[in-house]
UniProtKB/Swiss-Prot annotation:
HAMAP family membership: Cytosol_peptidase_M17
PROSITE patterns: CYTOSOL_AP (PS00631)
Native source species: Alkaliphilus oremlandii (strain OhILAs) (Clostridium oremlandii (strain OhILAs))
Name listed for the protein in its UniProt record: Probable cytosol aminopeptidase
Cofactor: Mn(2+)
CDD domains: Peptidase_M17 (cd00433)
Pfam families, sorted: Peptidase_M17, Peptidase_M17_N
EC number in record: 3.4.11.1, 3.4.11.10
Active site location: 279, 353
GO cellular component annotations of the record: cytoplasm
Subcellular location as annotated: Cytoplasm
Binding site for Mn(2+) 2: 267, 272, 290, 351
Family: Belongs to the peptidase M17 family.
Keyword Transit peptide: no
Amino acid sequence: MKIQVMKDQIKEIMADAIVIGIYEGTKSLNDNLKSMDLQLDGIITEMISSEAFKGKEGETLVIYSLGRIPAKKIMLLGLGKETDLKEDTIRRLTAKVVREAEAMKAKVVAMTAIGLDRGIAPELVGQCMMEGADLAAYKFDKYKTTDRNSGEGVQELYLLNEEESINKDLEKGFQTGAKLAQGTIIARNLVNEPSNVLTPTAMADKAIEIANNHGLEISILEKEDMEKLGMGSFLGVTKGSEEPPKLIAIKYFGNKEDEEIIGLVGKGLTFDSGGISLKPGAGMDAMKSDMGGAAAVLGAMDVIGALKPKVNVIAIVGACENMPSGKAYKPGDILTSMNGKTIEILNTDAEGRLVLIDCITYALKQGATRIVDLATLTGACIVALGHVTTALVSNDDDFVQQMYLAAERAGEKVWQLPSFPEYKELIKSDIADLKNVGDKGAGTITAGLFLGEFVEGRPWIHMDIAGTAMALGTKGYYAKGGSGVGVRTLYHLVKSMEK
C-alpha cells in the first residue's frame, strides 16, 4: 500500500473516498470541514446534530457526494472521546478505515491525520497510521485456488495535512511503521504456514533470508553440533521426529562499545503432537502454531536489522518437532541439559521448556547479559489470561517495567505473574534436579520458573504467548490466525535500551 502526505484541501481531493475523523461529542465542524459541508448541503452537520452519527470509536457512516465534490464518498469516522485517544487508537482507527474502504471497493482513500491535535508527535502519528494500515491489509490466502485476495483493497492512502513543516516527520514515521509492520507480517506468515511446509529446516532457511537481507551474522547448528555441546534436553524432544532439528543463532551488534547484549530466545516447535503423551485429536491442527515465540523473535530481528538501533542483540531459536515414535522420549526418562542439570520427564507434552533451556544456556555462552524468551508454553496461561494478555514471569522487576513500557508502545498487553519461592518447590524432582511439570496448579508460573533455573542470575523475562499468538477473529488491525504478537514489543524493548 502506498501512503503519503497530501496538502490539498479536503473538499478538492479526487479519491474514491475521503475519511473525516470526528470526536465523540463534537457539536461543530472546523472551518475546512464547514466549507465542504456547505457543498454537501449541510449533511455532515445534520448527521451530527441528529445523532445519526455520534463519533464513538470505530463508528462509521458513509455519505455519497453525488458529484458535489470530487470524491465519490465521504466516510465519517468516530474517533471516540478526545481524552481517550492514544497511540494504539491511531492504529485501530486506521485499520478500520482500510477494512471499511476495502468493503466498499475504494482503492484511493484520503483521510485526515489522527492524533496531531492531541499533541502526539507527527513521526509517531505517521508510524502508527502506517502500522494500522499495513497490518489491517494483511491476508494469508496463498493456498486458496479461488477467492484469493486479488489486490482489491486500498492501493493508495493519502494523509491530508496542511502544515508542511511536519511532513518530513510524518513521512519518517511512515517508513518506521512500514518496517514494524513488515516484521510483524513475517511472524504472522510463519505462524500461519502449515507444518508440512514450515519444517525446522524451512524455518532456518527463512532466518538465513532475514539475516542476509540486513547483513546480520547467522549460524545454524545441526543435530551433530548440538550433540557435541551436550544439548540433551533439546535433543531429547526431537528424538521421535524424522525432521532434523535446527538451532538458529542470529547476531546484531549496533553498539560495539556497549557490553550489554540482549538475548532473545524463541520456542520453535513447528509441530507439537505432544509426543508419547499425545494430545487429543480435536484442536491438534492448531499445534502448527507452537512456534509463535520463534516467529516473534525472527520478526523482531527483521525489524532490528532494518531500523538498526544502537544495541547488541543475540537471537536464538530452537526449531524442531515433538512426535511419537519408537525412538521418542518417554515419561519417566531423565534428560541432561547443556548446563548439566538433570530433568525428570513426567509429561512429554511439556516439551517447549526443554528446548528453551538449552537455547537459553547457548545464548548465555554466546555472551548474552540478559534474556527475554517467548513461547506458546502453557494452556494454563489461556485459563488465567484468555486471549488478551501475554503472561510474564521474571526475576527482575526493573526489567519488567521496561517491558511494560515497550508493550504499551506496541499496543500489546502484558502482565507479570508472581514468582514466590514456594512455586519453585513445585518443580523439584525426587530423582533428578528438576521435573518438567510442576505439581497441580500454577502451571504458567511453574513453567516460567523452570526456565528461570537456567538463566544463571541474569536479568530475565519469560513471555508466555499461548493465548495471544493467534487471533481468534478479525478485529482492529488483527486478522484471524497468527497475530505476530511480540515482534513490535521486542523491538521497542530493545530500542529503549540504547545507550
